[in-house]
Amino acid sequence: AEREIVRNIKEKLCYVALDFEQEMQTAASSSSLEKSYELPDGQVITIGNERFRCPEALFQPSFLGMESAGIHETCYNSIMKCDVDIRKFLYANTVLSGGSTMFPGIADRMQKEITAFAPPTMKVKIIAPPERKYSVWIGGSILASLSTFQQMWISKQEYDESGPSIVHRKCF
């Protein structure tokens, strides 16, 4: 039951700040960002900077004690591992998918962060389809049903022998 309450708070009240430090300053100096939430027992709690501090862990995993890159940096690193000839298409067609991308503000923040990493003249476009909560599952099921999909499979041995270039060779 507690997990459901937290999930409900996350889905109804949380958002990704475009500028985390600025948002922290705003939250510290005024109550404009605070929202009330009624618990099942009728108790009313106030949610303040937690509204954007929790999703910030997607961009700064160190908030959770993790030593890993945020989603923006992981996305950039993935693009940089691809063949140089297709990078501009990846920058211009980055699609958000999955439940954790449903936070309001996440597309604008990804746009800002990836633009900061990308070459200055690069066009960066983040696409956030409204149905993205289930798009991972839907896309996977469509891909698995294609008759041509099996020829795109890559074994660990193939990847170990060829590295990331095997993906480009087999899938494009």
UniProtKB/Swiss-Prot annotation:
Recorded GO MF terms: ATP binding; hydrolase activity
Enzymatic class: hydrolase
Task of the protein: Actins are highly conserved proteins that are involved in various types of cell motility and are ubiquitously expressed in all eukaryotic cells.
Annotated protein name in UniProt: Actin, cytoskeletal 3
A Pfam family it matches: Actin
Catalytic reaction list: ATP + H2O = ADP + phosphate + H(+)
Record keyword Hydrolase present: yes
Subcellular location: Cytoplasm; Cytoplasm, Cytoskeleton
Family per similarity comment: Belongs to the actin family.
Main location: cytoplasm
Organism annotation: Lytechinus pictus (Painted sea urchin)
Any one annotated GO CC term: cytoskeleton
Domain of life assignment: Eukaryota
Known EC number: 3.6.4.-
Keywords: ATP-binding, Cytoplasm, Cytoskeleton, Hydrolase, Nucleotide-binding
